[in-house]
């Protein structure tokens, strides 16, 4: 699915990984020869998803950031797996961002200063949401957001939607928290 998105948007990948069952191997090979990008082709019968294999290939190739397209394309099981895969990628040293037509999804940890500031000019849409990936996220402070928070805890079980659909009314806003993982 990701390669089809690249083709639709006129993007050239650095590396395309998967079984290419939905895109087609012949079509993939034609594009690869024309545009000169690398591939890592796998059989359709495997224990990992294409995205999991892509993360492993990106790590082996020394990438530090992965922009993943086609990871939210209609199957909830794959979408949730890909969101959880962001944690494994981050633990291995790869910052993974998932893009689709309406969303830019990435993982935040308390020590991630680089991705904790949200500049209005860099936003992917109007809204910014923070969802707990761990059972609890402690001490969330939202400065500069339309709906600020100060040292608030959120939990998957108690208030998982507290930080959904916030906005950045000024030039920038910042999030900080003590413990947990957010997407």
Can you describe what each PLM-predicted range is?
Residues 70-73, 100-102, 134:
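Generic secondary-structure microfeatures
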Residues 14-15, 37-39, 65-67, 95-97, ...:
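Structural motif
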Residues 2-91:
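Acidic/Gly/His-enriched mid-domain segments of enzyme catalytic cores or analogous surface patches
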Residues 60, 88-94, 135, 152, ...:
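Generic secondary-structure signature for well-ordered alpha-helical cores
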Residues 44-50, 95-99, 125-133:
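Short, basic, helix/turn surface patches
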Residues 77-78, 87-123:
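Class I SAM-dependent methyltransferase SAM-binding "motif I" and its flanking Rossmann-like core
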Residues 108-183:
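Long, charged alpha-helical interface segments
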Residues 45-49, 104-106, 155:
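A short acidic, often aromatic-flanked loop/helix-cap motif at beta-alpha or helix-coil junctions
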């Amino acid at each position: 699915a990701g390669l089809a998105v690249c083709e639709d948007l006129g993007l050239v990948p650095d590396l395309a990984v998967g079984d290419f069952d939905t895109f087609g191997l012949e079509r993939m090979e034609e594009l690869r020869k024309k545009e000169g990008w690398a591939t890592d082709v796998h059989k359709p019968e495997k224990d990992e998803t294409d995205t999991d294999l892509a993360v492993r290939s990106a790590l082996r190739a020394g990438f530090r950031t992965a922009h993943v397209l086609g990871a939210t394309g209609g199957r909830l099981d794959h979408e949730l797996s890909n969101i959880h895969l962001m944690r494994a990628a981050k633990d291995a040293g790869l910052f993974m961002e998932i893009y689709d037509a309406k969303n830019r999804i990435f993982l935040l940890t308390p020590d991630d200063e680089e991705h904790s500031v949200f500049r209005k000019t860099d936003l992917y849409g109007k809204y910014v949401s923070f969802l707990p990936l761990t059972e609890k996220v402690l001490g969330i402070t939202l400065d500069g957001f339309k709906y600020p928070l100060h040292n608030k805890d959120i939990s998957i079980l108690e208030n998982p939607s507290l930080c959904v659909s916030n906005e950045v009314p000024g030039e920038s806003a910042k999030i900080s928290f003590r413990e947990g993982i957010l997407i």
